[in-house]
Amino acid sequence: TGLWALPVLGLAQTFALGTGLNIAVGLVILARNAPPAQKKLVPLVLPGVVLWIVLAQSLFHKEWASLTTAGAYRMRGQAAESFAEYRAINQQPTLLYHRDGASATVTVKEFPKNHLFLQVNGKTDASTGTDMLTQLMLGHVPALLHAEPHSALVVGLGSGVTCGALLTHTGITNVDVVEISPEVVEAARY
């Protein structure tokens, strides 16, 4: 069900549905073994599960996506000189894109001053920050080390910067990209 539910409903709604179904099954099992007077409560199981799913929508608000994808990261070169500056540097990023897929939860977030980063399951895989050099070098170094490169294969699209770096080399006429998550392809547009 996760392969269907996660892309269609999202993580929060899949969680709500799964817990609701578990509660329903548990109550039905308990009701089967309950005294006859308590068996009258069995018809309330379905409305109770529906109520839980509706209430869960208010529990899993927009910040849910930011919290479940918050990864450990550090902002190199941004030492704060005051507490106010520390708070400004470490403020919450703006969530630009969020999608739960069958294989990953993908987000694109933005810190102030146009610092974008793409995360897969909370881990930053691409950004416009200091790791841009790494993304570029992953494309340039292999192309420069090969005597006559004509094509290349990139495993994992990320932001597409590595592919772009490869395509700047005149001998390379074809770059194939293998990406397991369609959500990463969508997010790369940012």
Please provide the spans of the model-predicted regions:
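Alpha-helical transmembrane segments of multi-pass membrane proteins
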Residues: 1-190
